Amino acid sequence: MLATRRLLGWSLPARVSVRFSGDTTAPKKTSFGSLKDEDRIFTNLYGRHDWRLKGSLSRGDWYKTKEILLKGPDWILGEIKTSGLRGRGGAGFPTGLKWSFMNKPSDGRPKYLVVNADEGEPGTCKDREILRHDPHKLLEGCLVGGRAMGARAAYIYIRGEFYNEASNLQVAIREAYEAGLIGKNACGSGYDFDVFVVRGAGAYICGEETALIESIEGKQGKPRLKPPFPADVGVFGCPTTVANVETVAVSPTICRRGGTWFAGFGRERNSGTKLFNISGHVNHPCTVEEEMSVPLKELIEKHAGGVTGGWDNLLAVIPGGSSTPLIPKSVCETVLMDFDALVQAQTGLGTAAVIVMDRSTDIVKAIARLIEFYKHESCGQCTPCREGVDWMNKVMARFVRGDARPAEIDSLWEISKQIEGHTICALGDGAAWPVQGLIRHFRPELEERMQRFAQQHQARQAAS
């Protein structure tokens, strides 16, 4: 998802201290993965059970929600901070800290929670599984998150193409209202909280939080300059927090089972469980919930049935959705699937959408296709993105044929660096990073293709 992010280097405001899950005296874990069924938060990920209210209640949703609400915002925020939960939409920003930005003295304006369900990142399909098969878990998360930040209502902005998901969500909202779980005096807690659904229109750019807010307000989905940040001036000019579907949906379970329980999974600063999408050249593509910091190789071999043709047939993996740089097989052997480990590997966790490519893949053509996507989805507001991504798209089309000179590889790298970090939102970064990953790890393939094209061109000239 096009997040509110700079994936490879987010920073915190000055004088803000963050407590991550690893700030304890407990012995550090050294192995990760093999999540037990009793520790899974999403128990209907594959839609094998009833997704309506009756089925959700039987699986533990809405259990003692009233007690959670009555404990108040400070307690909820404390548990979220203790858990070490970081944003699951790509940014990886500490959720407890982000939600606490809303807890300022009221100036009379209502506060809102906006849930980003505009899942448009190629390769990513985790949030739609929650919307389709566990909508009540999301609604309960909206209520708990809204209580934590004193929000009056939640707006769930759902991708326009998600027709069935939106339909299920609307049914779940109606059930929750009829049961008194949301609305006036939600769960009998004395807290009033409404939930509204807003349908998108198929624009990838609206996955960026301020473009999403613009779209909710009925305007063109174009990112806003920041500051002011949404926590000060968001939807309808009111304080707003924009959060990912998965981030919101796990919050009630964290409050019920305790932040310390959630922090017990994964490495320091990378705690909890996570939904991973595994697609591409694997035997059994799937969406699976696993422990953070699970080895990438184990994730593919255990849950997706392995790479087609065996592990030795692996060429490269895009580990976090199309906007994250690819990594070759040599890196995939040992890398862990969490924020910090993938940053060290010069890529990112992103949305944890693992795209596997075997040796049959034309890696240059694959990356060129991604650049074409970003060129198509650019809103055109920023010159580096509008002009730079269009230029990269044209150059990559020539690179696919080999119709270029080796010196142009360096020019492409330089242009990608000029786009990165010089745009209002992160779409420019998302277009630049796949190119950088390709050049970093597959430059010899580019040069060989150019050499082959030049030889064929010379042969044709000689023949004529």
Curated annotation (Swiss-Prot):
Residues 1-20 form a transit peptide. GO terms for molecular function: 4 iron, 4 sulfur cluster binding; FMN binding; metal ion binding; NAD binding; NADH dehydrogenase (ubiquinone) activity. It comes from Homo sapiens (Human). Core subunit of the mitochondrial membrane respiratory chain NADH dehydrogenase (Complex I) which catalyzes electron transfer from NADH through the respiratory chain, using ubiquinone as an electron acceptor. Part of the peripheral arm of the enzyme, where the electrons from NADH are accepted by flavin mononucleotide (FMN) and then passed along a chain of iron-sulfur clusters by electron tunnelling to the final acceptor ubiquinone. Contains FMN, which is the initial electron acceptor as well as one iron-sulfur cluster. Its EC number is 7.1.1.2. The modification N6-succinyllysine is found at residue 81. Binds 1 FMN. Binds 1 [4Fe-4S] cluster. SUPFAM superfamilies: Nqo1 FMN-binding domain-like (SSF142019), Nqo1 middle domain-like (SSF142984), Nqo1C-terminal domain-like (SSF140490). Keywords: 4Fe-4S, Acetylation, Disease variant, Electron transport, Flavoprotein, FMN, Iron, Iron-sulfur, Leigh syndrome, Membrane, Metal-binding, Methylation, Mitochondrion, Mitochondrion inner membrane, NAD, Oxidoreductase, Primary mitochondrial disease, Respiratory chain, Transit peptide, Translocase, Transport, Ubiquinone. FMN binds at residues 199-247. This is NADH dehydrogenase [ubiquinone] flavoprotein 1, mitochondrial. [4Fe-4S] cluster binds at residues 379, 382, 385, 425. It holds the Pfam family Complex1_51K. Core subunit of respiratory chain NADH dehydrogenase (Complex I) which is composed of 45 different subunits. This is a component of the flavoprotein-sulfur (FP) fragment of the enzyme. Interacts with RAB5IF. Its cofactor is FMN; [4Fe-4S] cluster.
